[in-house]
Amino acid sequence: NKYYERINAQIVEIELPFEYPNNWSVLRLKDICQLIDGEKRNGKSICLDAKYLRGKSSATTVEKGKFVYAGDNIILVDGENSGEVFTVPQNGYMGSTFKLLWLSSVMWKPYILAFILFYKEELKNSKRGAAIPHLNKELFNNLPIGIPPHQEQQRIAERINELSQLLK
């Protein structure tokens, strides 16, 4: 299989790390997933920082921040664990080291999250910055992702979940 991408006015052949079935599309992660700031708000709410989300500290409240809703996905973009994704357990303000992870509604969310998890170590080990390492957004945005039909996305995500349960 050969894959091509338009870069400016030129069509360029892209070398990919995997072979994909003919009925799959191949896109860049930035085409189906974006890192956004979230909605700025005022008023007391819980601070959803990494320690709290990992269960290593109790809840604190803050007066303002970037609001996220229960069920949203947020990704660490600063610090040693850049690239780690959390599902927000309750409404609140995301910690300052996070971005809201917007996922295209045409995709099966667990499939995209499994894809990002697959690259977690690579994202963690390719951070930018010396004092405070940051997520390598160029790497994140440009990861090629195979897009199977929707039912296949569901089947793959369910199988990954089943197998990961065996590893626990």
Spans of features found by a protein language model:
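Interdomain signal-transducing alpha-helices
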Residues: 112, 119-120, 153-156
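DNA target-recognition patches
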Residues: 5, 30-61, 69, 73-75
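Short amphipathic alpha-helical signal-transduction/dimerization elements
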Residues: 116-120, 124, 164
